Design a protein with these regions (language model features):
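Metal-dependent phosphoesterases centered on the DNase I-like endonuclease/exonuclease/phosphatase
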Residues: 49-51, 133-234
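Mobile, glycine- and charge-enriched loop segments
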Residues: 1-13
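Short amphipathic alpha-helices and their capping/turn segments at secondary-structure boundaries
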Residues: 20-23, 96-107, 136-153
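Structured beta-strand-rich core segments of catalytic domains in phosphoester-bond hydrolases
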Residues: 35-36, 41-125
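Active-site metal-binding loops of divalent metal-dependent hydrolases
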Residues: 7, 35, 161
Length: 235
């Protein structure tokens, strides 16, 4: 079982009982975003039951991604790729990590990617950073598809994309569409293009043509209670 989660800080998650939840789950491979901690601290928190690789952000206290595998069930193969490409800037660091894993006894390995896209903010430099990042992600996604075709190693890209794909992925579409980052047509087009190119939206495939399921809710008001959420996390 592969589980992807935005930790909103691994130290804060640890204090809230993250490891107890993880140990009780069937997770074999844990894909993490917003780790927001140095590699040494993150590895120490995960403990001896998990092997892990990390791509921390070069800006202290921001971003950071990781992949952990449960010892005795899954192992890593080769060296991880902790960058998206050679154009990675400090603000883009800690947002892309590739590693190959293999379940005990499995014939075929799996490339797992932990991705954390910029949240953005409409009409600000934050949005400019997001829109500069998305085409580069798309270029790497195309390379991964080509590599699978050539070498037979499938890829699973997981993470917090900070973009919905359609009206089904956000409770309040009309008041947000083209008004807030994450619901802009210029962002949505990238996700739908990747699906057209051959990637599968696993959550949507499993859920079907329904509203939701959501993966993020605002802290404001009663968003969680009213299930007024967004689906911005993908596998």
């Amino acid at each position: 079982t592969v589980t992807t989660v935005n930790l909103n800080g691994i130290r804060a998650a640890h204090k809230r009982g993250f490891l107890a939840w993880l140990d009780a789950s069937a997770t074999d491979v844990l894909v993490m975003q917003e780790v927001r901690a140095p590699e040494e601290i993150a590895r120490d928190i995960m403990g001896e039951a998990w092997d892990s690789v990390w791509a921390p952000c070069r800006i202290k206290g921001r971003a950071g991604v990781g992949v952990a595998v449960r010892r005795g069930r899954v192992g890593f193969e080769g060296e991880p790729r902790p960058v998206l490409d050679d154009a990675e800037t400090d603000v883009d660091s800690g947002r892309w990590l590739e590693t190959v894993v293999r379940r005990e006894g499995a014939q075929t390995p799996l490339r797992v990617v932990s991705a954390y896209f910029h949240s953005g903010e409409k009409d600000t430099p934050k949005q400019e950073a997001k829109m500069a990042h998305l085409p580069r992600v798309g270029a790497r996604m195309a390379e991964l598809l080509a590599d699978e075709e050539e070498n037979g190693v499938p890829s699973l890209v997981c993470g917090d994309f900070n973009v919905v794909r359609s009206e089904a992925d956000i409770k309040n579409w009309k008041p947000n569409h083209n008004k807030r980052a994450g619901v802009l047509d210029e962002e949505i087009v990238f996700l739908n293009r990747w699906v057209e190119e051959g990637w599968r939206d696993t959550v949507r495939d499993l859920a079907g043509d329904v509203q939701g399921p959501y993966s993020w809710w605002s802290w404001r008001g009663q968003a969680f209670v009213n299930n007024a959420g967004w689906r911005i996390d993908y596998q």
